Amino acid sequence: MRCPFCQSDDTKVLDTRLIDDGSQVRRRRECVSCGERYSTRETVDLNLPHLIKSDDSREAFSEDKLRSGLLKALEKRPVKTSQIETSIARIELKLMTQADREVSCIKIGEWVMEELKALDKVAYIRFMSVYRQFQDIEAFKKEIDRLMR
């Protein structure tokens, strides 16, 4: 791996650790040429199924879209970045273990709601209100009452 500071190819690994429940490898590196230290993260390059959208069109799974949706729901909520990354990894694992090469966006949405429900109930309600297209306050009240039981 090239040094991000001097672009040298001559680097060495000082430390290697598993992070995010073993879904990533963090390596601490040092450039032999300039002496700068930096960290890298490695993840598996996945061949994930395509998603079937509500209009029956297909699109490739996008981790960025998944992350963006989670971050919108979790905006200004007390949830650590590491918890969000772990949730993303769990959703991707579910996606990888699907036998089908195409998965409905509805299923992805359900998985996101499961993760948000475990992380933060307010974020869960935020996401659900958009995902399920709540039309009035009664829909919010009904879901909050269901959560409180």
From Swiss-Prot:
Domain of life: Bacteria
Recorded GO MF terms: ATP binding; DNA binding; zinc ion binding
Domain called ATP-cone: residue spans: 49-139
Pfam families associated with the record: ATP-cone, Zn_ribbon_NrdR
Zinc finger map (unnamed): 3-34
Annotated cofactor note: Binds 1 zinc ion.
Record keywords: ATP-binding, DNA-binding, Metal-binding, Nucleotide-binding, Repressor, Transcription, Transcription regulation, Zinc, Zinc-finger
Any one biological process term the GO annotation gives: negative regulation of DNA-templated transcription
Required co-factors: Zn(2+)
Role played: Negatively regulates transcription of bacterial ribonucleotide reductase nrd genes and operons by binding to NrdR-boxes.
Stated family: Belongs to the NrdR family.
Protein name: Transcriptional repressor NrdR
Organism listed in the record: Ruthia magnifica subsp. Calyptogena magnifica
Upper lineage: Bacteria, Pseudomonadati, Pseudomonadota, Gammaproteobacteria, Candidatus Pseudothioglobaceae
